[in-house]
Amino acid sequence: TLNLPAAGLAAGKRGTIDVNAHYQTVVPHIYAAGDVVGFPALAATSMEQARVAMVHAFDLKYKTKVAPILPYGIYTIPECSMAGETENGLAQKGVPCIAGVAHYDTNARGQIIGARHGFLKLLFAPDTMKLLGVHAIGEQATELVHTGLVALHAGATADLFIETCFNYPTLGELYKYATYDALGRRAKLRGESQAPFDPAAEK
């Protein structure tokens, strides 16, 4: 065993070790990162935690904290990935949202690669159309989520995806059409005669 008490440490009920924002334990010269500190226990986040710990240990003043929004990926078939808020999470907070969905089987690249199943879902704030969450299930979902992750960090709105010119044919275009879908849903809820943007006009 590790004999943690000999180092002045103790594991919690789930075998994890408590750390502060710098991943420093109660023993100042001992740091912990990764699975041993608990959720989310992912490779990507573990590496970021280790960088933060190293920077603090050597007083480098560079990367002082882990990014507030993290991506989560499950490498199943099909892949699943997300970043930001979920519909259930927002509902529990009493925060309204508009969801927009684009399916792989209606996307040119999705058709080319034979991805009959899969979708990208984007969550927006109804009033400002600020992006709140991104969810993907399907081929390359763990890659696809990164576009949304960057947009979340930038505090982007639907305008970013509408105004961006995506390569054609690519799965990246799903962002534009999921946004069109969200705008259409919002227009319908507001009783507007038509959505402010027409996806068909893009073709």
Which residues make up each language-model segment?
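Hydrophobic pocket-lining residues within nucleotide cofactor-binding pockets
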Residues: 36, 70, 104
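Rossmann-like dinucleotide-binding cores of NAD(P)H-dependent redox enzymes
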Residues: 40-47, 55-89
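FAD-site-proximal beta/loop scaffold in flavoenzymes
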Residues: 1-61, 143
